[in-house]
Structure formats: structure tokens, C-alpha cells
Amino acid sequence: MKRKKLWMLAAILTCGLELTACSISDNATKADTEAGTKADLTVLTEWQAGKTVSDKIVAAYGGLDKCFAAEPIPDGVWARMQGKTYKENPYIGRDDLRHIRALHWDYDNQIHVGEMICNKQIADRVVRILRQLFDAKYPIQRMLLPDVYGADDETQMRDNNSSCFCFRAIAGSTKLSKHARGLAVDINTLYNPYYKDRADGTRFIQPATAAEYCDRTKSFPYKIDHDDLCLKLFTEAGFEWGGDWKSCKDFQHFELIGE
């Protein structure tokens, strides 16, 4: 009888130790998960454009509605723009512009954090369009401020970056671009290039690496054409598409009509 009692006591103690170990392990796993979630959340709380996030992190942040907004330009972003996309000028200032936060999908079905600077006149429209594109899982490869590329348009286009504001002239001209006022948006720029056929038979292309994408009869990722959702949404919102221009073609480009 004593042996039986001792055996039962040993079994109870062993079970208790195992339960305690399981509890400690579960608590450690929970702590690790919470720490990981907190670390991942900083991608959104600090709005780290270019980083990827999961549906779970978006939900923990507060949901999709919180991830699409147009706000006054934060001090840190404004500092990054100085001497790059923004130069002192008499035409447009900080109060005329807005910082857009948005999420976007890529072709690999990953969610990316994006940002864009645009004129306050079109900010709400652009946010609405970007949300509709996200809801439709429309692929946009990158949405970074051109300042990341030193405000060099050729460089950012080669990287297929999508953007809006940059205080600069039209290529090959001294006339200010609609981008200089934040009234034009370029989407998936490598695959939707600008080109102009010259009188001498040569063709000027931007980005220079996009010659193969000037042939719009071909099928390739990120292509904008007349059946494209991005084109539909921008034109419905009062923008014109550079792909319809006669003297040149700018397939990436949407600018506000009449401004």
C-alpha cells in the first residue's frame, strides 16, 4: 500500500512539473509573439515606406482605414525633402502639399507600406484611388518619395517607383512639370515609360532602360492600358492619361485636367 501511495504521489508531482513546464513554455511563446508583433507594428507606427506588413499587423495597428490618409507633411519628411524634391520657390509651399500614407500590393501578393507627397487639391482623390487599387489587389511595385533616389527622376523610374510631387521642369524643357505642383501622379514607371519620337527618326525614352516596354502590343507585368483599373479610376477622378497624348506618350502619367 505504501509503495502504491508513493507511486501515485510521484505521478502527481511529475504531472505537476510537466504542467508547470508547459505553462512556462506557453507564456514564453506568448511573450515572444507579443514582442514580435510590437516590433512589426513599428513599421506602421513609424510609417517605414518600402517595408512589407501582414494582414495581422495591419489589424493590430487599427485596420485598413487607419493606413490610408492625407495629412500635413511631418517635420521629418519635410526635412528629407529639402534641396531634393523641394526647392525654395514662389509657386508652391509646404502648406500647399500633403503627405499621403497608403498600403499597396505587389505582383508577389505582398503588402507594402507606401507614401507620396501631392497637392492638397488632389490629396483626398489620390487617397481614395489608392485605397480602391489596394482593395482590388492592383499591383504597384514601389511607392517611395523620390528623395530616396536623390530626386533623380531617371533613377527612380528605373526602379519602377510610383510618386507624385517633385519640383522640376518637364524633361527637355525649362517649363515646370505638373509634378512641380504635386498635380500629377506616375504609376509603375519602368513598365509604363515616357517616349517622344524626334524629327531625325530617333526616339527619346525615359527611363532609358524601358525601350522594350514602349511596344504596347506586348503583355507584361504592371502595364497600364485602356482596360486598366488604375486608368479608369484616375480618369473618373478628373485626371488625363499621358498614354493618350499625340505628340508624345507618357504611359505612367496621370495629371489633373485644367490646372
Give residue spans per PLM region.
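Bacterial N-terminal signal peptides that target proteins for export
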Residues: M1-L9
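Bacterial signal peptide processing site
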Residues: S23-S25
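N-terminal module-boundary/linker segments of secreted carbohydrate-active enzymes
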Residues: D32, G36-Q110
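Active-site-adjacent loop/helix surface patches within enzyme catalytic domains
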Residues: P139-L183, T189-Y194
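Catalytic cores and adjacent binding grooves of peptidoglycan-active enzymes
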Residues: T42-W47, I170-L176, G182-E259
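Gram-negative bacterial Sec-dependent N-terminal signal peptides
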Residues: L9-L17
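Active-site acidic/histidine clusters and adjacent loop/turn architecture
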Residues: I92-M157
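C-terminal motif of bacterial Sec signal peptides marking the signal peptidase cleavage site
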Residues: L19-A21
